[in-house]
Amino acid sequence: MRRPMVAGNWKMNGTRASVAELIESFRRQALPAAVEIAVFPSFVHVSQVLDVVDGVQVSVGAQDCALQSGFGALTGEVSADQLVDLGCEWVLVGHSERRLVLGETDEVVSQKFAAAQAGGLKPVLCLGETLEEREAGRTLEVVARQLGQVLDDQGVEAFQSAVIAYEPVWAIGSGLTATPEQAQEVHAAIRDQLARSDRRIAEGVRLLYGGSVKADNAAELFAMADIDGGLVGGASLKADEFGAICRAAGN
């Protein structure tokens, strides 16, 4: 049985004051013990969040890590080892905003996935297609290519300590959401691709849906057989909304 997971990606948001207020609001939420909950603050707030999550059922991750592990001459980058030293457990890898805006290729994403695990973090590998690719009927092709790069480079065994998030790019921050059936089709294809290498591992990998997940659509999405939770963007900055999404995953 796969444990549901809800992950909150705070993106480039927050001040010290607003982050403290948000975590304090989380404390007042009735969060289901059956659901694994993680938040991904900006680098500048990771330490602050780690300092105040004691007593809150939330683990902490980073939104990115360097493509090399360890320490060394890579100005401006933060390694998985440094994030683990702070107390992080998770890291997002391959988010569409980094693929599209910052030009991260499938090869770079695969390197970051490997570096994350080498440093002791559990990666959340983000996959997803643009609106143009969906309208061209290429959704499954694009997602299979993105996943295939990591599978080929790192092997299916690497996914025993990783999570995959499907985020259709056209649904991120747009208010648009894939229907539960559209999302399930892609999630099933992802699990099938993993199963061609190892069915047991494939059955154990948690697959999250991201892309305008809200309290009013979460339950319908999470009811799908291969959707094990959500990667939540804007709604994770509202404690009541995020709490409701977590409770939907627990049901």
Curated annotation (Swiss-Prot):
Positions of the catalytic residues: 95, 167
Enzyme Commission number(s) of this protein: 5.3.1.1
Residues binding substrate: 9-11, 173, 212, 233-234
SUPFAM superfamilies recorded: Triosephosphate isomerase (TIM) (SSF51351)
Keywords for the protein's UniProt record, in alphabetical order: Cytoplasm, Gluconeogenesis, Glycolysis, Isomerase
Predominant location category: cytoplasm
Catalyzed reactions: D-glyceraldehyde 3-phosphate = dihydroxyacetone phosphate
Subcellular location: Cytoplasm
Record-level Gene Ontology MF annotations: triose-phosphate isomerase activity
Associated pathway: Carbohydrate biosynthesis; gluconeogenesis; Carbohydrate degradation; glycolysis; D-glyceraldehyde 3-phosphate from glycerone phosphate: step 1/1
PANTHER family hit by this protein: TRIOSEPHOSPHATE ISOMERASE
Function statement: Involved in the gluconeogenesis. Catalyzes stereospecifically the conversion of dihydroxyacetone phosphate (DHAP) to D-glyceraldehyde-3-phosphate (G3P).
Quaternary structure (record): Homodimer.
Protein name: Triosephosphate isomerase
Organism in which the protein naturally occurs: Stutzerimonas stutzeri (strain A1501)
Gene name linked to the record: tpiA
